[in-house]
């Protein structure tokens, strides 16, 4: 690890209303950058790693310092450009332009491989931004809890008559993303057994109440699961072991879970998936000394893992990929039928995307949890009829531990995002909350990503790999006046397999902010409806007509349907 990528320093975002930068529009990205590296948020903050293998917030510590300095000095009509975690320029733009534009990990397609990226990374020329690590809007595991919860609930609807009570989920991975799984299963009414190879991650999830219990052995874990499912209790159990060993063993024993998925960091075989029989320290050492051999060893273990998932699927157990590209890795190692079980988006989530419904999130820059609780109440007031959403907000308040600055996520669609943003802005203006609020989202959204093995898998018109859509999303959010906009490559599924865009907008209580919110929080989800309508989804066409979208090649939106 080059010296500049390691620093023994604790970073925490400022709280309260005293500004470090010149305005809230530059204070917000500054605080959110720092929040991504808060030790309560980031997986490895001393190496700038936020989550997802090597998903970083800045390329190295010199770049981090330069970004902080640039943001503190940035004027109201200037825009800072970030190239793979490095601040490369400040340009005069205008008041309604984004204050920061970010491009992370983007490579010309022919060279878009982990091998080439790792060479660039070693030379200090690139940075893997994951999705919300390099775009400074990660909020800890809460950021994926509701999406995972919605997935499990929909699986219960489809396979188990609408309930997961008395059922159990088998999965693996308790990192920044995977750590959401046990809590999401509990909230959905199911027991869960999550395999994790690092004890430190289990300890963190136990401490933050994302996991209820740890089993000492596989037999102990199965005994607990049997007892809790028989009693109808939703309890999450973690086991420190390697999934590539445990899943085949469960198949051999004839154990039958009720749902099977996986959220290990399989997208990154060099840093994110421990080969069977290896210790973590050995894995890290070999990643430096023999990267090719290490990647092959990891992928061989992934192949064993996927063969076990295929066996569960053949038993009739609902089995799905949760977006980490493990099927692709297994296929590259000779598992030709790796894609015989589906990804979670085509299986459970796409109808939501057709209506622009996705991971709307917001953060209280004040650091005061009461500001989030007040916005929770505002969401219930505005989206008054959605009892499912109200139930989520109640459960989130009860069970979800804030990591860093207080934040909330809830999945809402095109119909509601603009209304909620304007309401939050008014709360800031009236002093109902104590400081501005930032609104952002995961790049995993309906119109902001092209990822043929995840979000755009099995599109109706075959356009899975067309990546014009996230580029258009980023361009439109820039034109609409988002506070910062990001365009990344490789998030979630690794190099060569995705392109995706993000946006964040600040609610500072001003009329100017309201105008930007009105544009951004309509246009951003509208691109998702547009993308799915263009692909021929009737639900998306209906939503486009309801919301008055003008889509020239979709006849129904032109009064010709």
Curated annotation (Swiss-Prot):
Gene3D superfamilies: Urocanase like domains, Urocanase superfamily. GO terms for molecular function: urocanate hydratase activity. Its main location: cytoplasm. Its cofactor is NAD(+). The gene is hutU. Binds 1 NAD(+) per subunit. Keywords: Cytoplasm, Histidine metabolism, Lyase, NAD. It catalyses: 4-imidazolone-5-propanoate = trans-urocanate + H2O. PANTHER family: UROCANATE HYDRATASE. Pathway: Amino-acid degradation; L-histidine degradation into L-glutamate; N-formimidoyl-L-glutamate from L-histidine: step 2/3. GO terms for biological process: L-histidine catabolic process to glutamate and formamide; L-histidine catabolic process to glutamate and formate. Pfam families: Urocanase, Urocanase_C, Urocanase_N. One of its GO terms (cellular component) is cytoplasm. Catalyzes the conversion of urocanate to 4-imidazolone-5-propionate. This is Urocanate hydratase. Its EC number is 4.2.1.49.
């Amino acid at each position: 690890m080059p010296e500049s990528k390691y620093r023994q320093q604790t970073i925490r975002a400022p709280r309260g209303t005293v500004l470090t930068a010149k305005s809230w529009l530059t204070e917000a990205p500054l605080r959110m950058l720092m929040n991504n590296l808060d030790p309560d948020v980031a997986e490895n903050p001393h190496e700038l790693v936020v989550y997802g293998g090597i998903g970083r917030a800045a390329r190295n510590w010199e770049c981090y310092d330069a970004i902080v300095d640039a943001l503190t000095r940035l004027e109201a009509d200037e825009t800072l450009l970030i190239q793979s975690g490095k601040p490369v320029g400040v340009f005069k733009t205008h008041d309604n332009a984004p204050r920061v534009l970010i491009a992370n990990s983007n490579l010309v397609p022919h060279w878009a491989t982990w091998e080439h990226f790792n060479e660039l990374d070693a030379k200090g020329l690139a940075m893997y931004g994951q999705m919300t690590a390099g775009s400074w809007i990660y909020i800890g595991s809460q950021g994926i809890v509701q999406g995972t919860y919605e997935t499990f609930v929909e699986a219960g609807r489809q396979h188990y008559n609408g309930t997961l009570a008395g059922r159990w989920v088998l999965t693996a991975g308790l990192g920044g993303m995977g750590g959401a799984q046990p809590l999401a299963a509990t909230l959905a009414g199911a027991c869960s057994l999550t395999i994790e190879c690092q004890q430190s991650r289990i300890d963190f999830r136990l401490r933050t109440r994302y996991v209820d219990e740890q089993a000492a052995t596989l037999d102990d874990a199965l005994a607990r699961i049997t007892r809790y499912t028989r009693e109808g209790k939703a309890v999450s159990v973690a086991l420190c072991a390697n999934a590539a060993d445990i899943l085949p063993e469960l198949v051999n024993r004839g154990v039958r879970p009720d749902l099977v998925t996986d959220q290990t960091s399989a997208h990154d075989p060099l840093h994110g998936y421990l080969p069977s029989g290896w210790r973590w320290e050995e894995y890290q050492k070999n990643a430096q000394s023999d990267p090719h051999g290490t990647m092959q060893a990891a992928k061989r273990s992934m192949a064993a893992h996927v063969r076990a998932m295929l066996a569960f699927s053949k038993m009739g157990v609902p089995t799905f990929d949760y977006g980490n590209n493990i099927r692709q890795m297994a296929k590259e190692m000779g598992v030709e039928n790796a894609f015989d079980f589906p990804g979670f988006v085509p299986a459970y989530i796409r109808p939501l995307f057709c209506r622009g419904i996705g991971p709307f999130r917001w953060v209280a820059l004040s650091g005061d949890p009461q500001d989030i609780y007040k916005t929770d109440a505002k969401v219930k007031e505005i989206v008054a009829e959605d009892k499912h959403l109200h139930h989520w907000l109640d459960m989130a308040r009860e069970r979800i531990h804030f990591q860093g600055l207080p934040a909330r996520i809830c999945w809402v669609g095109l119909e509601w995002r603009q209304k909620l943003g304007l309401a939050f802005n008014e709360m800031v203006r009236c002093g109902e909350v104590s400081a501005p609020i930032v609104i952002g989202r995961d790049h995993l959204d309906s119109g902001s990503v092209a990822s043929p093995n995840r979000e755009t898998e099995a599109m109706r018109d075959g356009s899975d790999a067309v990546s014009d859509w996230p580029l258009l999303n980023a361009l439109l959010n820039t034109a609409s006046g988002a506070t910062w906009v990001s365009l990344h490559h490789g998030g979630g599924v690794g190099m060569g397999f995705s392109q995706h865009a993000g946006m964040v907008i600040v609610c500072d209580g001003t009329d100017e902010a309201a105008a930007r919110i009105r544009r951004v929080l309509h246009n951003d989800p509208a691109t998702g409806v547009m993308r799915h309508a263009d692909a021929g989804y009737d639900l998306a066409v209906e939503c486009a007509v309801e919301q008055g979208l003008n889509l020239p090649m979709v006849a129904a939106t032109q009064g010709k349907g």
